Amino acid sequence: MQPFFIFALFFFFAIAYNLLGPLVTSIMETNNLTLSQSGLLVSLLQVGALISLLLSLYLIKKLRQTTLLKIWYTVLMVALILIGLTSGNALLFFLYVAIGFGAFMIDSGSNGALSGDYFEKKELYIPLLHFSYSAGAIVTGYFILPFRGAAWRTAYVVAGIILALLLVLSQIIKPKEGAIAKAEAPIQTESNLPVLKSRNFILYTLALMLYMGSQQICATWIPVYTELELLQSPAIVGTSLTFFWVGIAISRLLSGLILQRGFKPLPLTLWGFLVAGGALALLPFASNIVLALILIALCGFAAGPAIPLYIVETSSWFPKNSAFIAMVYIIAGTVGRMIFPYLTTRLAESTSLGYALMVSSIMLFVAGVLVLIVKRSGRTERAPR
């Protein structure tokens, strides 16, 4: 599959995956869901991802990443369209498991395909891939505007149809034969045991898990916080999510350029976590919506490139294990997104969403400490640079 279609599909995958945040109040109203029940939808995404993980452990040795991408995009498209054509809470919960099932391999497969098949361009392609995700998430806040209220299911159908059209086009429009041969050449792999035995890899992955849990909390609950506690209009609610993802998108786009100028991923990640944690901790104390939006954007911007920086850095430690590293990153994200957003809703029900967001900033500070340990251990271990 050409990189262009990997980026384009990932853009609309981001829209589909992030529909819950700006539509959650509409879903709660039409389906009579409580705050914790809507938080369960986020956890069910990760349950589907874990099921997909178990299957991928077998398939990753049998099929190429691009083949798996086509399969899981099909699963995602079917689930999205069925959400729009069916009704009932039980079926909605089941289909969210299916979305998580497809999303796991889409995320892992896209990163694995680019960092493996296009290894020589990974420092450019990986940040661009995650920029595509951020750009899609930015558009989500406005994509859903015609579908708020009782028409929220239509947004899922439209997203599914667009993904289907792009997938068909990716099979019709092929690169030149020479380019295909280069992209599809088998990638030599080594044992994954050295990766799992690396203390630095484990600590860095734990830091990423905390960040991805925090990112999911922000992406899901910042719009709800803006609407229910800051009492803002639907347009401002959508803008709050947009500011978060604009910050992420800009930093991810810049990270590719910064890396090419010789900057190292670990220091960038460390300072990003600390600044983002500070911005999130200050958010509940914002005296007006303008200051709140600035803090939201800063939170997204500072920690935004953490995922592509992680993949670029760890792939340089273990260049022949890129597919496995991509899978581990998704596992870490799955655990973080499963546990922490749900705990946030439980805390919010007994206090407030603003307080819960402030407490979740601790996750970013802890992640920063873990990255600092990895960075300092570079004096004695081979991996960190």
Residue spans of the language-model regions?
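Extracytoplasmic gate region of multi-pass secondary transporters
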Residues: 20-21, 199-242
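Helix-breaking motifs and short loop linkers at transmembrane-helix boundaries and internal kinks
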Residues: 32, 64, 85-90, 119, ...
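Short hydrophobic/small-residue motifs within alpha-helical transmembrane segments
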Residues: 45-47, 134-135, 245-246, 334-336
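Helix-to-loop junctions at the C-terminal end of transmembrane segments
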Residues: 52-64, 252-264, 348
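Cytoplasmic helix-loop-helix junction between adjacent transmembrane helices
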Residues: 95-131
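Helix-loop-helix hairpin linking two adjacent transmembrane segments in secondary transporters
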Residues: 120-121, 128-175
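C-terminal transmembrane helical hairpin of 12-TM major facilitator-type secondary transporters
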Residues: 263-310
